[in-house]
Each structure stands twice: as C-alpha cells, then as structure tokens.
Curated annotation (Swiss-Prot):
<keyword id="KW-1003">Cell membrane</keyword>
<dbReference type="GO" id="GO:0005886">
    <property type="term" value="C:plasma membrane"/>
</dbReference>
<feature type="transmembrane region" description="Helical">
    <location>
        <begin position="339"/>
        <end position="359"/>
    </location>
</feature>
<keyword id="KW-0472">Membrane</keyword>
<keyword id="KW-0812">Transmembrane</keyword>
<dbReference type="GO" id="GO:0005304">
    <property type="term" value="F:L-valine transmembrane transporter activity"/>
</dbReference>
<feature type="transmembrane region" description="Helical">
    <location>
        <begin position="122"/>
        <end position="142"/>
    </location>
</feature>
<dbReference type="GO" id="GO:0015818">
    <property type="term" value="P:isoleucine transport"/>
</dbReference>
<protein>
    <recommendedName>
        <fullName>Branched-chain amino acid permease BraB</fullName>
    </recommendedName>
</protein>
<feature type="transmembrane region" description="Helical">
    <location>
        <begin position="375"/>
        <end position="395"/>
    </location>
</feature>
<feature type="transmembrane region" description="Helical">
    <location>
        <begin position="192"/>
        <end position="212"/>
    </location>
</feature>
<feature type="transmembrane region" description="Helical">
    <location>
        <begin position="311"/>
        <end position="331"/>
    </location>
</feature>
<comment type="similarity">
    <text>Belongs to the branched chain amino acid transporter family.</text>
</comment>
<feature type="transmembrane region" description="Helical">
    <location>
        <begin position="233"/>
        <end position="253"/>
    </location>
</feature>
<feature type="transmembrane region" description="Helical">
    <location>
        <begin position="158"/>
        <end position="178"/>
    </location>
</feature>
<dbReference type="Pfam" id="PF05525">
    <property type="entry name" value="Branch_AA_trans"/>
</dbReference>
<comment type="function">
    <text>Branched-chain amino acid transport system which is involved in the uptake of isoleucine, valine and probably leucine. Together with BcaP and BrnQ, plays an important role in the activation of CodY, a branched-chain amino acid-responsive transcriptional regulator that controls the expression of several dozen transcription units in B.subtilis.</text>
</comment>
Amino acid sequence: MKHSLPVKDTIIIGFMLFALFFGAGNMIYPPELGQAAGHNVWKAIGGFLLTGVGLPLLGIIAIALTGKDAKGLADKAHPVFGTIFTVVLYLSIGPLFAIPRTGTVSYEIGAVPFLTGVPERLSLLIFTLIFFGVTYYLALNPSKVVDRVGKILTPIKFTIILIIVLKAIFTPMGGLGAVTEAYKGTPVFKGFLEGYKTMDALASIVFGVVVVNAVKSKGVTQSKALAAACIKAGVIAALGLTFIYVSLAYLGATSTNAIGPVGEGAKILSASSHYLFGSLGNIVLGAAITVACLTTSIGLVTSCGQYFSKLIPALSYKIVVTIVTLFSLIIANFGLAQIIAFSVPILSAIYPLAIVIIVLSFIDKIFKERREVYIACLIGTGLFSILDGIKAAGFSLGSLDVFLNANLPLYSLGIGWVLPGIVGAVIGYVLTLFIGPSKQLNEIS
C-alpha cells in the first residue's frame, strides 16, 4: 500500500479528469460567451469559471473527502431520495442526453464540413455507429481508461486546442467586440449562469468516483492519502479547464470583426479555425472536437456501467455498457437540436439540487448532519428549480411568474431557488431544536 501517489501518476489522473470534463459543451460555450460579452469578456468568463470550474472542483473534493459516491451524498437527505436522484442524474448525463450529445456534436463539427452529397440521416448513422463502437470497446475495460485517456487521447486533444488558442492570442483576429444586450447589465452573473450549461457540477459527483478508483488502482488506499491525491488531480484538471476556457472566450471576443456576429459556439469555432488556418483549420478543429467528445463518452459510459450494475446486480457491467451504448446511439440519431431541446428543462430542474447537495456536504458538521436540514433545503430548492424547468420547457407560468419576478430575489436572474433553499435549511434546523433530530446521517447511510 502506497502512502502517497507519485507525481507522474497524479498528473496522468489529473489529465484524465480534465479529459472527462472537457467534453463538447465545454468547448462550444466559452467562444459563444466571448463573442456575446465583447469588452466585458473578462467579467463574464470570471462568472463562468465559478460554475464551470469551481463547482465541479467542489464536487470532486466532496467525493474525495466523504468517501461517498453520488448516491451516498444524496442519501444524506433520505435513501429513497438518494436512489431516485442518482438514477435521474446518471440518466441525464448518460444515455438520455450527454452521451448522445457527444456523438452528435462530434458529427456536426468533425464530419459535416467534409461531407458532400451524402444524405444527413445516413451519414449521421454511419458516423455514430463508428463513434459509439469505439466508445463501447474502450469502456469495456475501465481499468485501462486511465492509461488510454490520460496518456494518449488527452495530450493529443490538448495540443490541438493549444495550437488554436495560441494562434488566436498571438495573431488575434481583431479587437474585443461590442457588448451584446445580455452582457451589459451583469456580465459576471450572466457568465455564472452560462457555466451551468457545461453540466460539470452534475458530472463531478460521477467522475469523482472514477478518480477515486483510479487512485486506488495505483495502490493508494489510506483515506487521507486517497483524498489528497484526488484533490490534487482535481486541481490539475481545474487549472487546465481554466486556461482553455479563458483562451476560447478570448478567441470568441476577438472574432466578430473577422467572421461576423455568428452567435453559436460551434460555428464560431469552425469559422475562426478556418480564418486562422485556412482549410487546415477545419481538419484541426474536427479532430479536437472528436477526441474531446470521445473521451467524455468513454467516461460517461464507464460511470453508468459501474453504477447501474451495482444498483441492479442481475445486470453485469458488460450488459449495462451494451444497453447504455446502444440507447445512446439511438438517441444520437434524433440529432443535436432535439437532444438539446429535450435536455434543458430536466437539467434546469435537477442542477440546483446537485449544487445544494455538494455545498451541504462541506458544512453538514455545522448542523450536526441533521436530515431535516437536508430535506427542507432540498424541498425549498426543488420547488423553484422545477419552476425553472417548466419555464425552460416553454410553458408560461402566467401571473405566478410576474409575482415571483417582483417579489423573489434572484428569480429574474434564473436562480430564484437560492433564497428558498436557504430558508428551508434554516427551518429544518429550527424544527430539530423543537422536536429533536431524526436519526443521524451515519446511522442511516
């Protein structure tokens, strides 16, 4: 048994984690933010980093320090809630949305520019068959994920992206563009909300388990040494993400004069790469996107396989991986636009719950791990995050929306769940003072 993880292994696992986080959405959103924020890009990307890097890092640390998985953290409210929440979480960042999205995004950017005269449905089917075939093969043996992803795919991807961003930095396409309306008032806060789109706070409490298992596979099992190694790997991934996000946001912010106000992140990347490198730029970008999507897909399929085979012992890891991969292949062939449209309402509803679970895991010693605090806080948060999900689905809340906009702080900014969550936690704690706490968390977990 090792008492510490060698620096080399720490770096490899850190880059593996970076690769798992740095999926399709992570590459698309910063340039989109940059072009929209213009002169306010630095304030906006600062807010983006809080939710796109800070929250995921907290999720990794929470898993490392508590020694629990996603269900273990959610069980602190109640085991039934823990199971339901974790199943929804894995389905959302797994075969329903995130995994199919990796295939469709890599197709849109890595394949479409080079396809002419081929029917879209046929080309998408062929591409996703190959993409998920590779995913399936590499996910079948998770013990090799660290070496394959950390040693091979990540350096290739990082080098490609580095070439693009360095070219944009040293030979900028123009000055910082004009600020769009969305980023004029509160650019930091707008960037903060945009960071939700990465889904990385959700993924962090899943990927955290992958990191813990990777460290254990290197012979480090003592709890403190294990936690320290996981935190170091998390910091390495966070630093890598920060550099890439800031660079891509700058690329977007300086792109308007050269390529026009494109708006969509994928198109900004494609047009900017072509502007900077010519036809070679599309090849470079396509390779980077495909590798990024592939590494994320492998990590998500692996995590889903481990979780559901544990939840349902009758299903082996291989069977679950097969089901998840095939289902993802089917969903991917509905196309990127449909996947995103279906995912936003569900993510809007569950993302705040994940944030609350992560934050409470750091401070639960203060309120003596009382379940009532977890339950009341999650109820307060969930009621209003569900409203966000309903609005995101396109349904009108009518007079209720008007009332909440006028009376609930932060509601108009999309995080009206914050105050109800805090009030719920306080109410839960006060209740325990009058009626006594229920069983301690360590008795029910």
